[in-house]
Amino acid sequence: MSLINWFEEKRKFGGLIGAFIEKATKGYVLSEREKDRYINVDTNKGLWTRCDNCENMLYIKFLKQNKGVCEECGYHLQINSTERIELLIDRDTWIPMDEDMVAQDVLKFSDEDSYRNRISLSQKRTGLTDAVQTGIGNLNGTPVALGVMDFQSMGGSMGSVVGEKITRLIEYATQESLPLIIVCASGGARMQEGTLSSMQMAKISSVSQIHQVQKKLLYIAVLTYPTTGGVTASFGMLGDIIIAEPKAYIAFAGKRVIEQTLRQKIPDGFQVAESLFDHGLLDSIVPRNLLKGVLSEIFELYDLAPWKEKNNQV
């Protein structure tokens, strides 16, 4: 039996969520054949993962081939920053920037663990110095400046390094007249850095104003699950065009915080991308497998803008 046929058979029996789980919870004894069809999550952690939406078990190899999208329900699972760069940038054109920039524990912050240890563990686990990768590359032949946040690194939180790397990226894009793309995935400002983290919001917004308003260069913000806090309150919502992935969680404060502040019940799903789109806060919701093509078409239209031709003649 081929791997694909085996995989299809597993799907038929038990829906990839541990076959016959309803019977098992009622004291039902599995036959030898049923046990063979049962997928044990604990013993197959390197091969399988669970969809956060439909809870079906997904074979990781096939999931990666599908760009991190659940083939059962279409839910967009989180992917890391390197995978996003490979998804958007043409092969062998990526030039990273500021890879050696590392956060300093200026406040000597410590809660359950020291900030220094948290950074060290995150670097070992992800292979990244901090929660964003920035650089230059081609998107279907168009040179772009790209920043990609990584939620797996310190929850994608925005500290001094994240803010400085994005600031330098925007300044370079402004200097070289490049369009800018920032893919957001963040829990907000990094609390371990206090005011040093909060000030990054204003710093990034100020250089973005020069890039967009003074130089009339294009900035596209791509919001993914999750985009929250200080990132939403600054460059996440400053794009000339704001795109989100389907069902992405986008918010400033969490639902419980809002309910406790307003003292009223908030409807479910009001912080999901589809709800924000319905209320005019997003320009488009684009599935992950179509994103590169959509961005490419936007850049083609941008190149044909009449005001851009006038600027080139001056």
From Swiss-Prot:
Zn finger residue spans: C4-type: 51-73
Keyword annotations: ATP-binding, Chloroplast, Fatty acid biosynthesis, Fatty acid metabolism, Lipid biosynthesis, Lipid metabolism, Metal-binding, Nucleotide-binding, Plastid, Transferase, Zinc, Zinc-finger
Binding positions for Zn(2+) per the UniProt entry: C51, C54, C70, C73
Highest taxon, organism lineage: Eukaryota
Top-level enzyme category: transferase
Biochemical pathway: Lipid metabolism; malonyl-CoA biosynthesis; malonyl-CoA from acetyl-CoA: step 1/1
Alphabetical list of PROSITE patterns matching this protein: COA_CT_NTER
Cofactor binding: number and manner: Binds 1 zinc ion per subunit.
Compartments, as annotated in UniProt: Plastid, Chloroplast stroma
Catalytic activity reported: N(6)-carboxybiotinyl-L-lysyl-[protein] + acetyl-CoA = N(6)-biotinyl-L-lysyl-[protein] + malonyl-CoA
Family matches, as Gene3D superfamilies: 2-enoyl-CoA Hydratase, Chain A, domain 1
Cofactor: Zn(2+)
NCBIfam families from the UniProt entry: accD
Subunit structure and binding partners: Acetyl-CoA carboxylase is a heterohexamer composed of biotin carboxyl carrier protein, biotin carboxylase and 2 subunits each of ACCase subunit alpha and ACCase plastid-coded subunit beta (accD).
UniProt-recorded name of the protein: Acetyl-coenzyme A carboxylase carboxyl transferase subunit beta, chloroplastic
Organism from which the protein derives: Angiopteris lygodiifolia
Lineage, broadest ranks: Eukaryota, Viridiplantae, Streptophyta, Embryophyta, Tracheophyta
GN (gene name): accD
